[in-house]
Design a protein with these regions (language model features):
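Active-site region of glycoside hydrolase catalytic domains
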Residues: 1-200
Length: 200
């Protein structure tokens, strides 16, 4: 989160980004950060779940991180540290290995999950909002996406949607608690089937 928000709010990347991802950082032109950190009217946050990881030399870079890194392949291929004989996927993995960013995902047992396997943990939304509130001088916040994929069923003409109902109820409760703690949340947009028409 700080990878994206710190440049917007403070005009610089977190130091940890340069420590771990220096070889895949985008080229930063002279006035880029000044443009990126121009004043914004509001901050939109998409939130669905949390990810749990632990350190370990035997761990692997998560698929999510690899997908993000692949977007920077053009810049990575220009690096002299990477062999032209390796496949792109191997290049990325080797690069991450060189930077000592080994970790592995932790799949907790006996936790509620959505139909696509994401953990349901609304408390993480409260932590995100309060942490950002205490770290940055933020504009008003809008939750621009929040929701869950649920394998619901129609029973006697009625959609059995208890899990999704509970998901929204609990996450809205976290937003309410964040507001009580001083976070300036102005709006909340539930993710719905209509959102799929953006890309599906």
């Amino acid at each position: 989160t700080h990878w994206f928000i710190k440049p917007i709010m403070e005009g610089k990347y977190p130091e940890s980004v340069f420590q771990h991802f220096i070889n895949i950082m985008p080229t930063i032109a002279e006035n880029d950060m000044a443009i990126i950190s121009e004043k914004i009217d509001f901050l939109g946050l998409n939130f669905y779940s949390r990810s749990m990881i632990e350190s370990g030399r035997q761990g692997k870079v998560s698929d999510t991180i690899l997908r993000k890194i692949k977007r920077a392949e053009v810049r990575i291929q220009e690096s002299n540290d990477i062999s032209a004989d390796d496949s792109k996927g191997d290049q990325l993995q080797k690069l991450m290995n060189q930077k000592n960013t080994h970790y592995k995902s932790v799949d907790l047992e006996e936790v509620e999950r959505t139909h696509i396997g994401w953990e349901v943990y609304p408390e993480a939304l409260l932590k995100l909002l309060t942490d950002l509130h205490h770290t940055y001088n933020l504009p008003p916040i809008y939750i621009t996406e929040n929701g869950a994929a649920v394998d619901d069923h129609v029973i006697d003409g009625v959609v059995d949607d208890e899990q999704r109902y509970r998901y929204y109820q609990n996450h809205l409760s976290m937003v309410d608690q964040a507001i009580e703690k001083g976070v300036d949340v102005r709006g909340y947009f539930a993710w719905s089937l209509m959102d799929n028409f953006e890309w599906a």
